[in-house]
Amino acid sequence: MQPDLHCRTLAAHTLKHFRALSPLTHCMTNDVVQTFTANTLLALGASPAMVIDPVEARPFAAIANALLINVGTLTASRADAMRAAVESAYDAKTPWTLDPVAVGALEFRRRFCLDLLSLRPAAIRGNASEILALSGMALGGRGVDTTEAALAALPAAQALARQIDCIVVVTGEIDYVTNGQRTLSIPGGDPLMTRIVGTGCALSAVVAASCALPGAALDNVASACCWMKLAGQVAAERSEGPGSFIPAFLDALYHLDMEAANATN
């Protein structure tokens, strides 16, 4: 099954709908990336909410447009709050996205993520090692870093998407987005995106928010990946290193409506 190249014209069209909806996105993410994730969503036009307390997480997940579960700094108490939020989202039919950070390296989070899969995520976003581990095809990875190329994990992603009936995103130099039947590829980005903390986690939040949009989920999620790749390219051209890349990246996301509309395939 050969991946199709995602159309940037469609990504520009999807971004207009995204900004109009401004999805209220409940982010239960890791401590390292909270601010960057919130700023990424705001720059694109979404409305982030970083609600983590168990007492609040359950009711808030039911009223949000989308929910992100990121296990990067997982603890036992946080796992309880996340499970409560996912159960609430499932009951309310709120789409939720799983970011299984380092799932192949640590047993507690692996068991937790596998347990959550029964509650039907709308999307899963991870690097190649994480997707291979979550699918049961391999364990390992070097913490949050991948030891595999994205293309190597594509069969696992396609099988996982069919098994769970969701969208699976494998990120790398080229991102692959699949529903198990159809696969889209999104090239672009820049190596500087791997030299700062949080671009992958922020992408997971944007993927989660995109799942709140009407229409084809595969195209919406692929568009989210395209926005981030394009912003990374633009930011790299305007920055001198990681320190200046971050504000340039947020600016590129903020102005992306014009840049995406003018981009060619």
From Swiss-Prot:
<keyword id="KW-0460">Magnesium</keyword>
<dbReference type="InterPro" id="IPR000417">
    <property type="entry name" value="Hyethyz_kinase"/>
</dbReference>
<keyword id="KW-0547">Nucleotide-binding</keyword>
<dbReference type="GO" id="GO:0009229">
    <property type="term" value="P:thiamine diphosphate biosynthetic process"/>
</dbReference>
<keyword id="KW-0479">Metal-binding</keyword>
<keyword id="KW-0418">Kinase</keyword>
<protein>
    <recommendedName>
        <fullName>Hydroxyethylthiazole kinase</fullName>
        <ecNumber>2.7.1.50</ecNumber>
    </recommendedName>
</protein>
<dbReference type="GO" id="GO:0009228">
    <property type="term" value="P:thiamine biosynthetic process"/>
</dbReference>
<dbReference type="GO" id="GO:0005524">
    <property type="term" value="F:ATP binding"/>
</dbReference>
<feature type="binding site">
    <location>
        <position position="171"/>
    </location>
    <ligand>
        <name>ATP</name>
    </ligand>
</feature>
<feature type="binding site">
    <location>
        <position position="125"/>
    </location>
    <ligand>
        <name>ATP</name>
    </ligand>
</feature>
<keyword id="KW-0067">ATP-binding</keyword>
<dbReference type="GO" id="GO:0004417">
    <property type="term" value="F:hydroxyethylthiazole kinase activity"/>
</dbReference>
<comment type="function">
    <text>Catalyzes the phosphorylation of the hydroxyl group of 4-methyl-5-beta-hydroxyethylthiazole (THZ).</text>
</comment>
<keyword id="KW-0808">Transferase</keyword>
<feature type="binding site">
    <location>
        <position position="198"/>
    </location>
    <ligand>
        <name>substrate</name>
    </ligand>
</feature>
<comment type="similarity">
    <text>Belongs to the Thz kinase family.</text>
</comment>
<keyword id="KW-0784">Thiamine biosynthesis</keyword>
<dbReference type="GO" id="GO:0000287">
    <property type="term" value="F:magnesium ion binding"/>
</dbReference>
<comment type="pathway">
    <text>Cofactor biosynthesis; thiamine diphosphate biosynthesis; 4-methyl-5-(2-phosphoethyl)-thiazole from 5-(2-hydroxyethyl)-4-methylthiazole: step 1/1.</text>
</comment>
<feature type="binding site">
    <location>
        <position position="50"/>
    </location>
    <ligand>
        <name>substrate</name>
    </ligand>
</feature>
<dbReference type="Pfam" id="PF02110">
    <property type="entry name" value="HK"/>
</dbReference>
<dbReference type="InterPro" id="IPR029056">
    <property type="entry name" value="Ribokinase-like"/>
</dbReference>
